[in-house]
Amino acid sequence: MYKSVSETRHPLQSEEQEVGIDPLFSYSNKTRGDLSQNGRGSNSTLDTEGTFNSYMKEWEELFVNNNYLATVRQKGINGQLRSSRFRSICWKLFLCVLPQDKSQWISKIKELRAWYSSIKEIHITNPRKAAGQQDLMINNPLSQDEGSLWNKFFQDKELRSMIEQDVKRTFPEMQFFQQENVRKILTDVLFCYARENEQLLYKQGMHELLAPIIFTLHCDHQAFLHASESAQPSEEMKTLLNPEYLEHDAYAMFSQLMETAEPWFSTFEHDGQKGKETLMAPIPFARPQDLGPTVAIVTKVNQIQDHLLKKHDIELYMHLNRLEIAPQIYGLRWVRLLFGREFPLQDLLVVWDALFADSLNLSLVDYVFTAMLLYIRDALISSNYQTCLGLLMHYPIIGDIHSLILKALFLRDPKRNPRPATYQFHPNLDYYKARGADLMNKSRTNARGAPLNIHKVSNSLINFGRKLISPASAPGSMGGPVPGNNSSSSFSAAIPTRTSTEAPRHHLLQQQQQQQHQQQQQQQPQQQQQQHQQQQQQQRLMKSESMPVQLNKGQSSKTISSSPSIESLPGGREFTGSPPPSATKKDSFFSNIARSRSHSKTMGRKESEEELEAQISFLQGQLNDLDAMCKYCAKVMDMHLVNIQDVVLQENLEKEDQILVSLAGLKQIKDILKGSLRFNQSQLEAGENEQITIADDHYCSSGQDQGSQVPRAAKQASSEMPGCTGGTTPDDFILVSKEDEGHRARGAFSGQAQPLLTLRSTSGKSRAPACSPLLFSDPLMGPASASASSSNPSSSPDDDSSKESGFTIVSPLDI
């Protein structure tokens, strides 16, 4: 028997010191201690009561109101179920395991649990127990009859062994999934589902969909047991959160989830193109994934990349297509496992909260897929094939997983969801490049060949060809035609048959011709073998190199010939001295070395060009972002400036002129952001100017000579014009651009920025437009444009006749 707490006290221990309580004592036996122990027990009771109160408060906030389901869904989308102790119940509501009517919860959950018990009893059987009730001719271990329990038992054993093999690899970093009872639950649920769905059976990856469900149920059960230690929970809680039915509830939730995910695991092919005409007229330049029958998951990931990604980021879409990274490489795992391997388990549960809360058909998966690509888009665009593959197959850790959900919601419906904060990702690209290289090396092991082996094979083929040709050229003293191939038949036929009396005179010529024929017959197979060798090498390079940049550049190399051309020489003529066979061997040997060196140089050049292209793509992406930002800022500024100008003109203000002048300056900034005005870089170098001023020749795109003539012409015109005071400064007048000539006819302030009707000086006086000293000289129109501009002083650079819209790149020589 266990001794009391007072009897187990150490003799040297003081009475005021706290004493540990034996955990095997019941709550009633704990009250038998001394006063200090009673005080400690009361404190623990208060703590447990506080825990139960917070537990009940969370239950009431989630489920005790009329519109509770909408509240729970919103919390799931907003990521507020991360620390919830009722996440499993929320998932049951999202997956329609529990009805919306709370009065039917208990009856529905009991029905589902009884359903799983019957399924388990049917499919998980022991043939030894039913041996006495069956015919032994059919029911025996050696029977192959379909109705034999032993035959079914061995088939089930094979299926269970395949499931157990995957279950052992489920979340190996977590101790929870290494427990035998948890593994048994995983195996039984997956086995029962496979037997209930014979058309699908079990597919690899299903265990990673079931594991988070079991983990969530286990956490909620532990929280329930902890909260029920201090108080008595309701019968509804006891029924829904009973730990004895963890396996039953997991099967019900997993079955509902697979109602949507079943097509993603199905291997049945569906051919969208049927009919005889499709076979006769195939699609030209179609990708391999677009031809022939495909499974549903392949169609889904192709649509995500070809439509969603192309819509939201055309640059990233083109980059992945240029690298030939098909979405099946990484997308199959992303979608099938609901991103189970891309995030840590706690972050994964938050993602599943949003996916389940959004809709039962999991339509948010497509946009989470796209948001994940956009999160690492800068790293992908600036990387080559290996690094991109490493990033996609080993997705980096995200600091705030909820920002990814907000991005996905914004991509789907930007009107209802605000734009999330811009997040930057700066990974260690060397790490992902190494991971991508490992993946590529595994796939290239059988495809890559050594260059030395290629040369050895080609040389052996050449020597073998020479042995076959050498017997044909042996009879050199005969006067008949020398047998040869088709290319030399015309040449041999041109030699007439000589008599024995003419033999001494033509003996030397015949020997020379026979040597030439032999050399020609030896060199022609050598050229053919070298060309065949280069073609094989290019094919191996095309198989081994996955980047299309390398393919396009590798095919432009020219064929190198190691021997002089003989096909162009006419038959019957005396040839110049051809190289002997030994020289030909040396030339072929050194040409092979030269080809290997040129190949290494070509590969080095390709790598440098790839890096340059990656940098150009990255810079082009930044330029596109800046361009979009400037246009957006110009659009918003235009809208607000029009509103401010309308209000100012309607009110009689004391300093109205100064406000209008400031508005004109802001319109100049708007035009610079929009690209209507050229921005001179020298304005920043001249000093810290408080105001952006535009010179008279600001809109001239010609050289410095023409630009220097415009201010002088402006000064002369201003001095000759009557009624204009000579004490004005360039700051007295602000040139306001107008958007379009047709805006005057539509009336003032019709939704876009309009020019001011008068040019106002800083002194507050209004001046007539004829007194403006600002003249516009078009260098393309000649001097006449200077005088013509005086009649239309309000012309602005926004007119299409004088400039082009958008940004222009100004070289330092033009400034």
UniProtKB/Swiss-Prot annotation:
**Stretch list, region Required for interaction with retromer:** 56-64
Tell me where on the tree of life, at the top rank, the source sits: Eukaryota
List GO molecular-function terms, semicolon-separated: GTPase activator activity
Which residues does this entry mark as bearing Asymmetric dimethylarginine?
R448
Instruction: Write down the position(s) of the site called Arginine finger.
Output: R169
Q: Which keywords does this Swiss-Prot/TrEMBL entry list? A: Autophagy, Cytoplasmic vesicle, Endosome, GTPase activation, Membrane, Methylation, Phosphoprotein, Protein transport, Transport
Transport keyword on record: yes
Locate the compositionally biased regions of type Low complexity.
483-492, 510-539, 556-568, 783-796
Q: Name one GO cellular component term.
A: autophagosome
Query: Which Pfam family, just one, is annotated for this protein?
Result: RabGAP-TBC
Q: Where is this motif: LIR 1?
A: 57-62
Q: What is the annotated localization of this protein? A: Endosome membrane; Cytoplasmic vesicle, Autophagosome
Q: Where is this region: Disordered?
A: 475-591, 702-733, 754-815
Tell me the residues on which Omega-N-methylarginine occurs: R448
Residue numbers for the site described as Glutamine finger? Q204
Function as written in the Swiss-Prot or TrEMBL entry: May act as a GTPase-activating protein for Rab family protein(s). May act as a GAP for RAB7A. Can displace RAB7A and retromer CSC subcomplex from the endosomal membrane to the cytosol; at least retromer displacement seems to require its catalytic activity. Required for retrograde transport of cargo proteins from endosomes to the trans-Golgi network (TGN); the function seems to require its catalytic activity. Involved in regulation of autophagy.
Give the domain note. Answer: The arginine and glutamine fingers are critical for the GTPase-activating mechanism, they pull out Rab's 'switch 2' glutamine and insert in Rab's active site.
Mind telling me what this protein is named? TBC1 domain family member 5
Species in which this protein is naturally found: Mus musculus (Mouse)
